[in-house]
Amino acid sequence: MTETLTIRRPDDWHVHLRDRDVLRGVVPYTARQFARAIVMPNLSPPMTDVAGVAAYRDRILAALPQGSAFTPLMTLYLTDSTDIEEVARGFAEGVFVAAKLYPAHATTGSAHGVTDIRNIYPVLEKMQEIGMPLLIHGEVTDSHVDIFDREAVFIERTLTRLVADMPALRIVFEHITTEEAAQFVEGAGDSIAATITPQHLHINRNAMLVGGIRPHAFCLPVAKREKHRLALRKLATSGFSRVFLGTDTAPHAKHLKEAACGCAGIFNAPFALESYVTVFDEEGALDRFEAFASLNGPAFYRMPVNEDRIVLERAPIEVPEVIDCNGTAIVPFHAGETLGWRIAAA
């Protein structure tokens, strides 16, 4: 039985770092484990131009622990009125590495998102031309579509057509949650990749609803039936090269989760690697963990892999019920549980 696992330092290809006091409280957890992270732009107001994204990057760098080598990889928030030249300039100058498509009202901070993907086709055509990745929250938002079906309907109605119209556009189908999404990505061409969160590998929708409403298991896209969780585990641990680590860590204050209308999002950053490696251990795929965590993402984003290493060891670690993040109480994923792996050297 493997007792230690040494891998290249991973990257997290989907994080929410928030801003101000909460940013300062949560960013150390990501920076401790990961060399780089794709930072979501859905602040209030959202990061819709070069100047705003650059200023946010500066705030993240200022919030890092002293001596940290962590690099935030920034993204642009797309709207119906996004300027094509602003997109091209920010990408060329290295201010952001990708653009994020939120269908309007699909999730937290998406009110300014795109109302119809055809509205931004000229922007997407420019992105295809310059090789800029598009990151997609893949759900429809029609009120008549069941929340558990929104990802599958998005594939059928929007994503399939987009890929046909722009076959060279580099797309990351983020935080996939369904068997349909796993099959779509596996069957697509080399321009399509996906991220998978730790929660969607560990829990199904029962975690939210059995024995009472469990707000800390609520995120968007919501966890689905057990067959979907199993399909995601199969894909993540298969060695498939176009799927990679993206936590979608989404911190919210405890009292905002435990409310009549609680926020969507799971704060998984503090024990992200421990959570992921547990899945690979359970699936007998520890030999494939480095590819998922450290190699596949850089390959898709056309970035070098990290040279330094991180060591994980088989040893119990207790996850606290609550974490004080610079004055904000936040409940982490796996709260109150004991995980079987921990970071030995980072």
Swiss-Prot record:
<feature type="binding site">
    <location>
        <position position="248"/>
    </location>
    <ligand>
        <name>Zn(2+) 1</name>
    </ligand>
</feature>
<feature type="binding site">
    <location>
        <position position="175"/>
    </location>
    <ligand>
        <name>Zn(2+) 2</name>
    </ligand>
</feature>
<feature type="binding site" description="via carbamate group">
    <location>
        <position position="100"/>
    </location>
    <ligand>
        <name>Zn(2+) 1</name>
    </ligand>
</feature>
<feature type="binding site">
    <location>
        <position position="137"/>
    </location>
    <ligand>
        <name>substrate</name>
    </ligand>
</feature>
<comment type="pathway">
    <text>Pyrimidine metabolism; UMP biosynthesis via de novo pathway; (S)-dihydroorotate from bicarbonate: step 3/3.</text>
</comment>
<keyword id="KW-0862">Zinc</keyword>
<feature type="binding site">
    <location>
        <position position="220"/>
    </location>
    <ligand>
        <name>substrate</name>
    </ligand>
</feature>
<comment type="function">
    <text>Catalyzes the reversible cyclization of carbamoyl aspartate to dihydroorotate.</text>
</comment>
<dbReference type="InterPro" id="IPR004721">
    <property type="entry name" value="DHOdimr"/>
</dbReference>
<dbReference type="GO" id="GO:0006207">
    <property type="term" value="P:'de novo' pyrimidine nucleobase biosynthetic process"/>
</dbReference>
<dbReference type="GO" id="GO:0004151">
    <property type="term" value="F:dihydroorotase activity"/>
</dbReference>
<feature type="binding site">
    <location>
        <position position="137"/>
    </location>
    <ligand>
        <name>Zn(2+) 2</name>
    </ligand>
</feature>
<dbReference type="GO" id="GO:0005829">
    <property type="term" value="C:cytosol"/>
</dbReference>
<dbReference type="InterPro" id="IPR032466">
    <property type="entry name" value="Metal_Hydrolase"/>
</dbReference>
<feature type="binding site">
    <location>
        <position position="16"/>
    </location>
    <ligand>
        <name>Zn(2+) 1</name>
    </ligand>
</feature>
<feature type="binding site">
    <location>
        <begin position="16"/>
        <end position="18"/>
    </location>
    <ligand>
        <name>substrate</name>
    </ligand>
</feature>
<comment type="similarity">
    <text>Belongs to the metallo-dependent hydrolases superfamily. DHOase family. Class II DHOase subfamily.</text>
</comment>
<dbReference type="Pfam" id="PF01979">
    <property type="entry name" value="Amidohydro_1"/>
</dbReference>
<keyword id="KW-0665">Pyrimidine biosynthesis</keyword>
<dbReference type="GO" id="GO:0008270">
    <property type="term" value="F:zinc ion binding"/>
</dbReference>
<feature type="binding site">
    <location>
        <position position="252"/>
    </location>
    <ligand>
        <name>substrate</name>
    </ligand>
</feature>
<keyword id="KW-0378">Hydrolase</keyword>
<keyword id="KW-0479">Metal-binding</keyword>
<feature type="binding site">
    <location>
        <position position="264"/>
    </location>
    <ligand>
        <name>substrate</name>
    </ligand>
</feature>
<feature type="binding site" description="via carbamate group">
    <location>
        <position position="100"/>
    </location>
    <ligand>
        <name>Zn(2+) 2</name>
    </ligand>
</feature>
<feature type="active site">
    <location>
        <position position="248"/>
    </location>
</feature>
<feature type="binding site">
    <location>
        <position position="42"/>
    </location>
    <ligand>
        <name>substrate</name>
    </ligand>
</feature>
<protein>
    <recommendedName>
        <fullName>Dihydroorotase</fullName>
        <ecNumber>3.5.2.3</ecNumber>
    </recommendedName>
</protein>
<dbReference type="InterPro" id="IPR006680">
    <property type="entry name" value="Amidohydro-rel"/>
</dbReference>
<feature type="modified residue" description="N6-carboxylysine">
    <location>
        <position position="100"/>
    </location>
</feature>
<comment type="subunit">
    <text>Homodimer.</text>
</comment>
<feature type="binding site">
    <location>
        <position position="14"/>
    </location>
    <ligand>
        <name>Zn(2+) 1</name>
    </ligand>
</feature>
<dbReference type="InterPro" id="IPR002195">
    <property type="entry name" value="Dihydroorotase_CS"/>
</dbReference>
<dbReference type="GO" id="GO:0044205">
    <property type="term" value="P:'de novo' UMP biosynthetic process"/>
</dbReference>
